[in-house]
């Protein structure tokens, strides 16, 4: 029968035909990511080198859209490649169908050249829709082994949003081909109903009015639950079957959205009040200094001490005389004005008795001194006068004040003041003192005399390095050194005795 009949009518032909059908079905369902798919001999004979249409897009493998039904909303691309009468061997009939096929192929290739990349859709919805269509075709074609539709080129069913449209004066064109290259991705995402494109549009125009921004946000948030589920499924599918032509940012998971219904809307007054209260709350929040109770108490004590003045030597009272800063930080200084006020009796309510100690040498003291001042230039004389028989005030509320000075109050006066304080500390238990208030006249007799000459006796001034008193100066200095040496020796002996005693 194989010899008398037409070629390929025997069992061998059927087995070969079944292998071709299985090969086509395997290629259809495998969905390989390679962009270079080898064409079958049948495709090469039908379409030539243009059978591999996925090379035109440079992305994932793609197939021709089905343009079979223009009027009903879906059309198959095989209308342009009109199905020719194939013989049982899969070859074209040499009758008039060749001209129809060539004309259809040329028109089909013309459409592909107009929009090669846009015609090959790669959206996730199109993949899902096309896959369902192809499963139906494959199931129906399993029982039709010997029919000619097994040799038809593979069809890709497009999404209904990507149908071809006919312009007034031109052929059928894809709506994606009307977009420019920059708006291609936005167009595809718009058909998907994805919120990503809408968010980017809001970012491009940040200076919109409040009303317009609210309208746009309402439109974005008014998604139904069904549309949200479709968007989630499509975005999850795009992670597996994403076209290389799409940017990587679209491969990221979708943004979370809150369903907002039309009936549940806030009035404008409530929104404005909420915004104003939120802004006031943010303004009220700020960095504030935290102060503990202990810090407050210490600060108050320091402020009180600074306002009241420094304390006296036994820390029991505040100094009766106003003090100023001087050369030695451990001593308290007073101005010539304060000493003049002390002499005039302005502090009688606080002071029972005061002493002005002139620490200069005798010839300086005789040359001019402050009224009522005592000339004590050696430490022995000072200790004998104040410590042998300490002076105690009769009124416990009043005080006894001692003011030291020399020519400039730089060396001799401060040294005598420290000597008296040391001896007083040694004789009393800390912090008790016989003479807690000791002062230094700032500037000495040199500054006091020009301003208050009437308070000096005699009203003259004799400097330490006077030409007429050089010999007396040497004698006083040697005497002071001897007294100083004797005092240091006595101190060392006292320390040794203290260490030896049990």
Curated annotation (Swiss-Prot):
Region annotated Disordered, chain positions: 126-150
One GO location term (cellular component): nucleus
Post-translational modification: Phosphorylated by CHEK1 and MAPK14 at Ser-245. This phosphorylation creates a binding site for 14-3-3 protein and inhibits the phosphatase. Phosphorylated by PLK4. Phosphorylated by PLK1, leading to activate the phosphatase activity. Phosphorylation by PLK3 at Ser-217 promotes nuclear translocation. Ser-224 is a minor phosphorylation site. Phosphorylation by CDK1 occurs at G2 and G2-M transition and leads to increased activity.
Pfam families reported for this sequence: Rhodanese
Listed InterPro entries: MPI_Phosphatase, Rhodanese-like_dom, Rhodanese-like_dom_sf
Active site: 406
Protein family per UniProt: Belongs to the MPI phosphatase family.
Function comment: Functions as a dosage-dependent inducer in mitotic control. Tyrosine protein phosphatase required for progression of the cell cycle. When phosphorylated, highly effective in activating G2 cells into prophase. Directly dephosphorylates CDK1 and activates its kinase activity.
Protein name, per record: M-phase inducer phosphatase 3
Organism: Sus scrofa (Pig)
Organism placement in taxonomy: Eukaryota, Metazoa, Chordata, Craniata, Vertebrata
């Amino acid at each position: 029968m194989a010899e008398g009949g037409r070629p390929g009518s025997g069992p061998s032909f059927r087995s070969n035909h079944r292998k071709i059908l299985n090969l086509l079905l395997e290629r259809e369902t495998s969905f390989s990511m390679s962009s270079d798919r080898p064409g079958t001999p049948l495709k090469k004979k039908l379409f030539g080198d243009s059978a591999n249409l996925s090379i035109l897009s440079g992305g994932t493998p793609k197939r021709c859209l089905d343009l079979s039904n223009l009027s009903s909303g879906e059309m198959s691309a095989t209308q342009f490649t009109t199905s020719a009468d194939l013989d049982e061997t899969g070859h074209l009939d040499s009758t008039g169908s060749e001209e129809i096929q060539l004309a259809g192929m040329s028109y089909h290739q013309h459409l592909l050249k107009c929009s090669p990349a846009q015609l090959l859709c790669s959206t996730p919805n199109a993949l899902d829709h096309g896959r369902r269509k192809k499963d139906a075709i494959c199931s129906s074609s399993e029982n039709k082994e010997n029919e000619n539709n097994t040799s038809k080129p593979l069809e890709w069913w497009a999404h209904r949003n990507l149908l071809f449209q006919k312009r007034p004066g031109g052929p059928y064109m894809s709506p994606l081909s009307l977009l420019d290259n920059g708006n291609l991705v936005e167009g595809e995402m718009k058909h998907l109903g994805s919120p990503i494109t809408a968010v980017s549009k809001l970012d491009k125009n940040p200076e919109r009015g409040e009303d317009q921004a609210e309208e746009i946000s309402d439109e974005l948030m008014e998604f139904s639950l069904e549309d949200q589920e479709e968007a989630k499924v499509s975005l999850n599918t795009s992670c597996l079957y994403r076209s290389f032509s799409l940017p990587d940012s679209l491969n990221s998971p979708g943004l979370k959205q809150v369903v907002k219904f039309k009936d549940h809307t806030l009035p404008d007054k409530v929104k404005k009040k909420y915004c104003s209260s939120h802004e006031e709350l943010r303004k009220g929040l700020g960095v504030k200094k935290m102060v503990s109770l202990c810090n407050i108490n210490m600060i108050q004590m320091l402020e009180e001490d600074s306002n009241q003045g420094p304390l006296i030597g036994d820390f029991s009272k505040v100094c009766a005389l106003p003090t100023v800063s001087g050369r030695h930080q451990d001593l308290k200084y007073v101005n010539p004005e304060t000493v003049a006020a002390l002499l005039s009796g302005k502090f009688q309510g606080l002071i029972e008795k005061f002493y002005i100690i002139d620490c200069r040498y005798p010839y300086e003291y005789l040359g001019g001194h402050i009224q009522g001042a005592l000339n004590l230039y050696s430490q022995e004389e000072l200790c004998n006068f104040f410590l042998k028989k300490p002076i105690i005030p009769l009124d416990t509320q009043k005080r006894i004040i001692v003011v030291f000075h020399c020519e400039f109050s730089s060396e001799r006066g401060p040294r005598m003041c420290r000597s008296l304080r040391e001896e007083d500390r040694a004789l009393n238990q800390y912090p008790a003192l016989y003479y807690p208030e000791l002062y230094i006249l700032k500037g000495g007799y040199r500054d006091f005399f020009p301003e208050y000459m009437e308070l000096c006796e005699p009203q003259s001034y004799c400097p330490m390095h006077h030409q007429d008193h050089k010999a007396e100066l040497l004698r006083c200095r040697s005497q002071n050194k001897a007294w100083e040496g004797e005092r240091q020796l006595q101190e060392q002996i006292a320390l040794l005795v203290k260490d030896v005693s049990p």
